[in-house]
Amino acid sequence: MTDSHTSGRCGWCGTTDPLYIAYHDTEWGVPERDPRALWEKLVLDGFQAGLAWITILRKREGIRDAFDGFDPEIVARYDEADIQRLLGDVRIIRSRAKIKAAIRGAQIWLEMRDNGEDFSAWLWSFVGGEPIHTPFADYRQAPTQTEQSVAMAKALKKRGFNFCGPVIVYAFMQAVGMVNDHQTTCFRHAQVRAMAGHG
């Protein structure tokens, strides 16, 4: 039997790292509608590019603190001194390109808000405003990208966001509950489905 069957969880999260298990059991796949929380998750997924998600999880609180709680109003005003400060902060992923992408993302988030656009509603529109519940019994059956993630990635890039290719965007969609990819043998699949009002 696989870990996914013996633990009652998705096979990808394993059974040994408490941080990973807690993330799977309480966060991953839960529908997120808060615009600021969605932007934070998009930034974190961008930081993950080329790295394992557990690396980001272990650094998340440090990244959040270094980026002023992911307050777009503050991050959007970061200058070269802030970039240098962040590049010297061992708590984060010290990539100039990723740091600059986060700053630009905050500026775009504010531009959208100031233009009366709801960042959350815009992102959720790519799945018709409701979570997609997949029927996979094994997490390895899930795709790495979909028509929706390709469309969202293209739209994000058109807006000026970076580190948001279709594979990163699909991982984002899974994490924020736009797609319920908890395998059907996982206890969270039905719980997340119920959260979305599809019990």
Please place each PLM-identified region on the residue numbering.
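HhH-family (HhH-GPD) DNA N-glycosylase catalytic core used in base-excision repair
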Residues: 1-199
